[in-house]
């Protein structure tokens, strides 16, 4: 089956049922060490994960690690430009769950990004990025502890799909010509809304299937959270891109109010129900007026539409959601993308799960990570219905490779996500406690140590791993 790698002789495969992992007590898990500082951070991560599993389960559970290759290390073994060998793809497909360090961006043609390639090959449609603050972590924000969100980013669509042509290419010029002449010609009504002939051009596909499976997974996650965190916010720019980002929002609401009707309430529904609870005799029109402050300035047709919305909500879900019962449901709302960038800074404790498309999610997850301490502490997972890959969210930092100084927190916390995904919560909790206590005691690597006041003597990467284990208790 494999050309240059050999699986462990002990251990079992993780399988999947209805999109969820079925995990044996001794799973085989492929790992990619990673390029650059992967040589430092992976050994530290493996040591912490193994120690947590051993302590939590007293030998009843154990991970059998399976070394596979990608990036520069793969080229060293498999040959030039073999950044993502078939052996590695076969192993991840066979064993279902994998973890990896940072990977270099390939030079030359072919694969544009190894991370994107893995997501597309295995249909890992949900990029999951928790952003929470660990006490003692230096942050430029006054109250970083108020931010505790999970970004659910659609991973396989949007402009990141990579369907684009450079300026001057034959196909690009042809496409622009067809669009200008046949689909968006200048008209007296709309004027000249055309693409300049010297443009590069890309395509932004957003599908109903892709949008709804992402929102479905986000809502399922929300249902596992404490009641005060059961909220999913659909982040979009639908006010401008109505048929892509606006459709994402609409499809998200459609999924929530059909497939999860008894478990969810939309923000507008909550307003309608609350108005009725505060004033049982409120008229449909007055209820509509309260949920839409500009109601009286609307056209008669628009007024009738909102009144009908109020009537439909009360007739359909008052019995199941009224009299305060909606407060026990997962709240589904939406926010414009540029607004949410402000609100995670000014009103961070109002949000929990942020579900969004690929490009917005890339920006948003990095911005949120910066608030709580940066990408060095930012974990990530790419999850599909029959595979999951957990990863460092930072780059390879080759100038620090082999110096035993880089912060392994991102990969360690990605390992925590992996353990939680597997249902091994006890081991995950040990690591979170150990990491939190180490940071609170200023036992940190150089990237955090230099920002503390007063500065402290930094730990090596390997020493930070030892400190985490020591604080398991």
Curated annotation (Swiss-Prot):
Which keywords does this Swiss-Prot/TrEMBL entry list?
Answer: Glyoxylate bypass, Magnesium, Manganese, Metal-binding, NADP, Oxidoreductase, Tricarboxylic acid cycle
The superkingdom listed in its UniProt entry is Bacteria
Q: What residues bind NADP(+), as annotated?
A: 104, 394-400, 407, 446, 450
Q: How is the cofactor bound?
A: Binds 1 Mg(2+) or Mn(2+) ion per subunit. Mn(2+) is the most effective divalent cation in vitro, but the enzyme can also use Mg(2+), Co(2+) and Ni(2+), with lower efficiency.
Query: How is the activity of this protein regulated?
Result: Inhibited by either oxaloacetate or glyoxylate. Also inhibited by the adenine nucleotides AMP, ADP and ATP and by NADPH, which inhibits the activity by 28% when it is added to the assay mixture at 0.25 mM.
What EC number is given for this enzyme?
A: 1.1.1.42
Q: Which InterPro entries match?
A: IsoCit/isopropylmalate_DH_CS, Isocitrate_DH_NADP_dimer_prok, IsoPropMal-DH-like_dom
Instruction: Tell me which PROSITE patterns the record gives.
Output: IDH_IMDH (PS00470)
Q: Name one GO biological process term.
A: tricarboxylic acid cycle
Catalytic function, reaction form: D-threo-isocitrate + NADP(+) = 2-oxoglutarate + CO2 + NADPH
User: Needs which cofactor?
Assistant: Mg(2+); Mn(2+)
Q: Give the Gene3D superfamilies listed for this entry.
A: Isopropylmalate Dehydrogenase
Q: How does activity depend on pH?
A: Optimum pH is 8.5. Shows 75% of maximal activity between pH 7.5 and 9.5.
Q: Which family does it belong to?
A: Belongs to the isocitrate and isopropylmalate dehydrogenases family.
**Its function?**
Catalyzes the oxidative decarboxylation of isocitrate to 2-oxoglutarate and carbon dioxide with the concomitant reduction of NADP(+).
- Output this protein's name: Isocitrate dehydrogenase [NADP]
Q: Could you read off the lineage of the organism from its UniProt record? A: Bacteria, Bacillati, Cyanobacteriota, Cyanophyceae, Nostocales
